[in-house]
UniProtKB/Swiss-Prot annotation:
<dbReference type="GO" id="GO:0061512">
    <property type="term" value="P:protein localization to cilium"/>
</dbReference>
<dbReference type="GO" id="GO:0000242">
    <property type="term" value="C:pericentriolar material"/>
</dbReference>
<dbReference type="GO" id="GO:0060271">
    <property type="term" value="P:cilium assembly"/>
</dbReference>
<dbReference type="GO" id="GO:0030674">
    <property type="term" value="F:protein-macromolecule adaptor activity"/>
</dbReference>
<dbReference type="GO" id="GO:0015031">
    <property type="term" value="P:protein transport"/>
</dbReference>
<keyword id="KW-0653">Protein transport</keyword>
<feature type="repeat" description="TPR 6">
    <location>
        <begin position="335"/>
        <end position="368"/>
    </location>
</feature>
<protein>
    <recommendedName>
        <fullName>BBSome complex member bbs-4</fullName>
    </recommendedName>
</protein>
<keyword id="KW-0472">Membrane</keyword>
<comment type="similarity">
    <text>Belongs to the BBS4 family.</text>
</comment>
<keyword id="KW-1003">Cell membrane</keyword>
<feature type="repeat" description="TPR 3">
    <location>
        <begin position="199"/>
        <end position="232"/>
    </location>
</feature>
<keyword id="KW-0206">Cytoskeleton</keyword>
<feature type="repeat" description="TPR 4">
    <location>
        <begin position="234"/>
        <end position="266"/>
    </location>
</feature>
<dbReference type="GO" id="GO:0034464">
    <property type="term" value="C:BBSome"/>
</dbReference>
<dbReference type="GO" id="GO:0060170">
    <property type="term" value="C:ciliary membrane"/>
</dbReference>
<keyword id="KW-0813">Transport</keyword>
Length: 462
């Protein structure tokens, strides 16, 4: 009998020992068990943080804006805003400036408002929005915003300049029993000594003084402006004109001559000098001056008006008519051009056309006594004596012009109303005695009429 193997297990069913599958054994935790440490991970590379500078393209944007290349500038602005999610303050600011220069004022205000929000509500942007509101005609809102801007921009003369311009457009009204004068208020703002550093501001101050009748203040302002900008031909013109208005002809010619020295083709200076020459009956020299101005500034109604007067003085009515018609086409609302056309048509015996232009002149400027007097002359040429007499009386009522009064005296003499003619002639003599300037031709005509009016009295005495 063979010995049995003790390692052999006899039987069909095998009962596994718990130690055969150790993974399935869950030991009961004890207080002495310590959790195993976590597995060590390989160190990862540090993350790279990219710092975005939203102002990196500002230099290129300002470069295109300064050059006036708005297309490229707007392209750069679009790139900046799309890349930095519209968080660039300078881009909105420059875009607003471009929109304002292009006349898109509402878009400009929207851009300035966004820049204002991004800047932490910087009050300096009230200056930009105030200018937009001024251009839109919202003067009250413009004054409020520019006043806020002046609190942080006290040394910027442009803020005060635009504030004065906005106040200048206010209506004159009574406030608490006092009359509010916008021109006086605007001048008061610009009279501050610490802001008188800008030529444009001082030039506007001179215009305000001139409007208020302060001639000496206007001259002083224009001189100060010339010290800041010695080559400013516009200020030279204004100073020359105010010298001429005050009777300082020599000083006026000096300023106009300086203007032509800087700009020989300056149409405004040439027009002023030419008109003075025409007043002294030097029409040929004036026309030569106008020829230079016409080459540079052909589309100038006042220039062609003066050319027409010069040609009429040289007895060229057809050429004068062409020049005056061109002047009327360029500037149809200038009453002086309509007046000259009326006088020209009356000289050419075209009385209906003359009456049409003189009537247009009186509609443009109803209180023009000279035009009403010219209408009376034309009506008398048309044998409308009743309306001519009414026009003469209306003209004398508006202003006692020596030429109109003398024409009325001659008209009444022709109508055989000696009494009315004598009264009109007496009124003319009184004006002449009071120092009113009368031409030598008018004086000679008045003396002749006086001698004629005395003849019926002498024959009645005999």
């Amino acid at each position: 009998m063979e010995a049995s193997n003790q390692d052999e297990i006899i039987g069909t069913d095998v009962i596994p020992n718990e130690q055969d599958n150790p993974e399935e054994v869950v030991p009961e935790p004890t207080s002495l068990d310590v959790p195993p440490p976590p597995p060590e991970r390989a160190p990862s590379a540090p993350k790279r943080v990219e710092i975005l500078d939203c102002n990196s393209l500002n230099g290129l944007m300002y470069h295109y804006f300064a050059q006036g290349d708005y297309i490229e500038c707007k392209s750069i602005i679009g790139e900046i805003q799309s890349k930095y999610l519209e968080r660039n303050e300078a881009a909105f600011h420059v875009r607003g400036l471009i929109a304002r220069n292009e006349g898109e004022l509402e878009e400009a205000m929207e851009c300035f408002h966004k820049a204002y929000e991004l800047s932490g509500k910087n009050k300096r942007y009230f200056y930009e929005t105030g200018r937009c509101n001024f251009l839109l005609g919202r003067h009250q809102i413009a004054v409020e915003q520019l006043t806020k801007a002046s609190e942080v921009m006290k040394d910027n003369p442009k803020v005060w300049y635009w504030l004065a311009r906005a106040i200048y457009h206010f209506p004159a009204e009574k406030v608490q029993g006092k009359t509010f004068n916008p021109v006086e208020s605007a001048r008061t703002i610009l009279m501050k000594p610490d802001i008188a550093k800008d030529a444009t501001l001082i030039c506007f101050l001179g215009r305000l003084c001139e409007e208020l009748g302060d001639t000496s203040g206007a001259i002083a302002a224009y001189k100060s402006s010339l010290k800041l900008q010695p080559d400013n031909t516009e200020v030279m013109n204004l100073l020359g004109l105010i010298y001429l208005r005050t009777g300082q002809v020599q000083e006026g010619f000096v300023q106009l001559g300086n203007c032509l020295a800087y700009d020989p083709a300056n149409s405004q200076a040439i027009l002023t000098i030419g008109s003075i020459m025409q007043n002294h009956s030097d029409h040929d020299v004036a026309l030569n001056k106008y020829r230079v101005a016409a080459d540079v500034s052909d589309y100038n109604g006042c220039l062609w008006n003066n050319i027409g007067i010069g040609l009429l003085a040289r007895n060229k009515p057809a050429a004068s008519h062409s020049a005056l018609k061109k002047a009327a086409f360029i500037n149809p609302l200038n009453y002086k051009i309509s007046y000259n056309l009326g006088v020209l048509h009356d000289i050419m015996n075209l009385h209906c056309s003359a009456l049409h232009y003189i009537k247009l002149c009186t509609e443009l400027y109803p209180q023009n006594a000279k035009a009403v007097g010219a209408m009376a002359v034309i009506l008398s040429h048309m044998n409308d004596d009743k309306n001519a007499r009414l026009a003469y009386k209306k003209s004398i009522e508006l202003k006692k012009n020596p030429s109109t009064i003398l024409n009325y005296a001659i008209f009444e003499y022709r109508m055989k109303d000696v009494t009315a003619a004598s009264n009109a002639l007496k009124l003319y003599k009184d004006l002449q005695a009071s120092g009113v300037k009368c031409s030598a031709n008018n004086k000679e005509t008045a003396n002749l009429l006086e001698s004629v009016l005395k003849q019926p009295d002498q024959s009645a005495e005999q």
